[in-house]
Amino acid sequence: MNRQKKLVILVLRYVSIFLNLFKDSGYHKILSPFDGNIVPSDMIAESNISRDVFGNSLGIQPVENKVLSPCACIVERISPVGNAMLLKVGNAHLIINIGLEFEKYKKEFFKLNVVEGQRLSKGQKLMSFDIEKIYKVDTNFVCTITVKQNRTSRHVSFINAKHVSFDTILCTLNVL
Protein backbone atom coordinates (compact mmCIF):
# COMPACT_ATOMS: atom_id res chain seq x y z
CA MET A 1 0.00 0.00 0.00
CA ASN A 2 2.80 2.40 0.84
CA ARG A 3 4.39 1.80 -2.54
CA GLN A 4 1.09 2.52 -4.33
CA LYS A 5 0.67 5.83 -2.47
CA LYS A 6 4.18 6.89 -3.43
CA LEU A 7 3.48 6.00 -7.04
CA VAL A 8 0.21 7.98 -7.04
CA ILE A 9 1.94 11.00 -5.48
CA LEU A 10 4.74 10.79 -8.05
CA VAL A 11 2.26 10.57 -10.94
CA LEU A 12 0.26 13.54 -9.57
CA ARG A 13 3.43 15.64 -9.33
CA TYR A 14 4.33 14.92 -12.94
CA VAL A 15 0.79 15.67 -14.09
CA SER A 16 0.89 18.96 -12.17
CA ILE A 17 4.23 19.93 -13.71
CA PHE A 18 2.92 19.02 -17.17
CA LEU A 19 -0.26 21.08 -16.73
CA ASN A 20 1.69 24.10 -15.48
CA LEU A 21 3.63 24.13 -18.75
CA PHE A 22 0.40 25.04 -20.54
CA LYS A 23 -1.13 27.25 -17.87
CA ASP A 24 -1.96 30.81 -18.90
CA SER A 25 0.60 33.07 -17.27
CA GLY A 26 -2.02 35.81 -17.00
CA TYR A 27 0.12 38.30 -18.90
CA HIS A 28 -1.26 39.56 -22.19
CA LYS A 29 0.56 41.80 -24.63
CA ILE A 30 -1.87 44.42 -25.89
CA LEU A 31 -1.10 45.44 -29.46
CA SER A 32 -2.21 48.66 -31.06
CA PRO A 33 -5.62 48.25 -32.71
CA PHE A 34 -4.72 51.24 -34.92
CA ASP A 35 -1.92 52.46 -37.16
CA GLY A 36 -1.33 56.11 -36.38
CA ASN A 37 0.16 58.86 -34.28
CA ILE A 38 -0.06 58.85 -30.47
CA VAL A 39 -2.07 61.51 -28.66
CA PRO A 40 -1.49 61.48 -24.87
CA SER A 41 -4.76 61.12 -22.93
CA ASP A 42 -4.30 64.50 -21.23
CA MET A 43 -4.32 66.17 -24.68
CA ILE A 44 -7.72 64.72 -25.63
CA ALA A 45 -10.66 67.13 -25.42
CA GLU A 46 -13.05 64.53 -23.90
CA SER A 47 -12.66 65.09 -20.15
CA ASN A 48 -13.48 61.51 -19.08
CA ILE A 49 -10.66 60.23 -21.30
CA SER A 50 -8.19 62.98 -20.40
CA ARG A 51 -8.74 62.33 -16.68
CA ASP A 52 -8.63 58.52 -17.12
CA VAL A 53 -12.09 58.19 -15.51
CA PHE A 54 -12.85 54.82 -17.14
CA GLY A 55 -9.28 53.53 -16.92
CA ASN A 56 -5.89 54.31 -18.39
CA SER A 57 -6.30 55.66 -21.91
CA LEU A 58 -4.22 56.37 -24.96
CA GLY A 59 -5.30 58.34 -28.02
CA ILE A 60 -4.26 57.57 -31.58
CA GLN A 61 -4.92 59.62 -34.70
CA PRO A 62 -5.30 56.86 -37.28
CA VAL A 63 -3.62 56.88 -40.67
CA GLU A 64 -5.52 53.76 -41.79
CA ASN A 65 -9.26 53.18 -41.70
CA LYS A 66 -9.25 49.75 -40.06
CA VAL A 67 -9.23 48.45 -36.49
CA LEU A 68 -7.66 45.14 -35.45
CA SER A 69 -8.09 43.09 -32.29
CA PRO A 70 -5.29 44.04 -29.86
CA CYS A 71 -5.18 40.52 -28.33
CA ALA A 72 -7.18 37.33 -27.92
CA CYS A 73 -10.43 38.49 -26.33
CA ILE A 74 -14.23 38.37 -26.41
CA VAL A 75 -16.46 41.12 -27.83
CA GLU A 76 -18.76 41.98 -24.92
CA ARG A 77 -20.54 45.02 -26.31
CA ILE A 78 -20.74 47.14 -29.45
CA SER A 79 -22.18 50.66 -29.37
CA PRO A 80 -25.44 51.31 -31.27
CA VAL A 81 -23.64 53.48 -33.85
CA GLY A 82 -20.78 50.97 -34.16
CA ASN A 83 -17.94 53.31 -33.23
CA ALA A 84 -17.06 51.69 -29.88
CA MET A 85 -16.44 48.20 -28.52
CA LEU A 86 -15.94 46.65 -25.11
CA LEU A 87 -13.53 43.71 -25.25
CA LYS A 88 -13.00 41.28 -22.36
CA VAL A 89 -9.48 40.00 -21.64
CA GLY A 90 -9.40 37.84 -18.49
CA ASN A 91 -10.57 40.09 -15.66
CA ALA A 92 -9.80 43.27 -17.61
CA HIS A 93 -11.71 45.16 -20.29
CA LEU A 94 -10.48 47.15 -23.26
CA ILE A 95 -12.67 49.98 -24.51
CA ILE A 96 -11.98 50.92 -28.11
CA ASN A 97 -13.48 54.15 -29.44
CA ILE A 98 -13.32 55.25 -33.04
CA GLY A 99 -13.85 58.92 -32.35
CA LEU A 100 -15.44 60.43 -29.28
CA GLU A 101 -18.22 62.57 -30.79
CA PHE A 102 -20.56 59.59 -31.29
CA GLU A 103 -23.70 61.75 -31.40
CA LYS A 104 -22.37 63.24 -34.67
CA TYR A 105 -21.70 59.85 -36.30
CA LYS A 106 -23.94 57.73 -38.47
CA LYS A 107 -23.99 53.95 -38.59
CA GLU A 108 -22.98 54.09 -42.25
CA PHE A 109 -19.56 55.48 -41.21
CA PHE A 110 -18.62 52.06 -39.76
CA LYS A 111 -18.46 48.53 -41.19
CA LEU A 112 -18.35 45.93 -38.43
CA ASN A 113 -16.60 42.60 -38.99
CA VAL A 114 -17.51 41.09 -35.58
CA VAL A 115 -20.57 40.56 -33.39
CA GLU A 116 -21.19 40.63 -29.65
CA GLY A 117 -20.13 37.42 -27.93
CA GLN A 118 -17.58 36.54 -30.60
CA ARG A 119 -14.15 35.20 -29.56
CA LEU A 120 -11.34 36.99 -31.34
CA SER A 121 -7.75 36.18 -32.04
CA LYS A 122 -4.96 38.74 -31.94
CA GLY A 123 -4.88 40.81 -35.14
CA GLN A 124 -8.38 39.88 -36.31
CA LYS A 125 -10.17 42.71 -38.14
CA LEU A 126 -12.81 44.34 -35.93
CA MET A 127 -14.07 47.00 -38.31
CA SER A 128 -13.32 49.59 -40.90
CA PHE A 129 -14.51 53.18 -40.98
CA ASP A 130 -14.88 56.07 -43.40
CA ILE A 131 -12.22 58.44 -42.14
CA GLU A 132 -13.20 61.28 -44.52
CA LYS A 133 -16.85 61.30 -43.43
CA ILE A 134 -15.87 61.24 -39.77
CA TYR A 135 -13.42 64.15 -40.18
CA LYS A 136 -16.20 66.19 -41.86
CA VAL A 137 -18.37 65.98 -38.72
CA ASP A 138 -15.60 65.71 -36.09
CA THR A 139 -12.60 67.97 -36.66
CA ASN A 140 -10.98 66.71 -33.43
CA PHE A 141 -11.27 63.05 -34.51
CA VAL A 142 -9.14 60.73 -32.41
CA CYS A 143 -9.40 57.03 -31.59
CA THR A 144 -8.79 55.75 -28.08
CA ILE A 145 -8.02 52.54 -26.27
CA THR A 146 -8.82 52.42 -22.57
CA VAL A 147 -7.75 49.66 -20.19
CA LYS A 148 -10.32 49.10 -17.45
CA GLN A 149 -9.19 46.70 -14.74
CA ASN A 150 -10.62 45.62 -11.43
CA ARG A 151 -9.65 47.49 -8.26
CA THR A 152 -6.84 45.12 -7.34
CA SER A 153 -5.01 45.60 -10.63
CA ARG A 154 -2.10 47.95 -11.07
CA HIS A 155 -1.72 51.11 -13.10
CA VAL A 156 -1.14 50.52 -16.80
CA SER A 157 1.87 52.11 -18.47
CA PHE A 158 1.54 52.60 -22.19
CA ILE A 159 4.42 52.67 -24.64
CA ASN A 160 6.30 55.95 -24.95
CA ALA A 161 6.30 56.55 -28.71
CA LYS A 162 5.05 59.02 -31.29
CA HIS A 163 3.76 56.52 -33.83
CA VAL A 164 2.32 53.01 -33.52
CA SER A 165 1.49 50.35 -36.07
CA PHE A 166 -0.70 47.29 -35.72
CA ASP A 167 2.13 45.14 -34.37
CA THR A 168 3.30 47.67 -31.74
CA ILE A 169 2.93 46.46 -28.15
CA LEU A 170 1.07 49.24 -26.28
CA CYS A 171 1.23 47.64 -22.83
CA THR A 172 1.25 44.33 -20.97
CA LEU A 173 -1.62 43.36 -18.67
CA ASN A 174 -1.76 40.88 -15.83
CA VAL A 175 -5.35 39.70 -16.22
CA LEU A 176 -5.55 36.90 -13.65
Spans of features found by a protein language model:
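Contiguous, well-folded functional domains in the mature portion of proteins
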Residues: 1-176
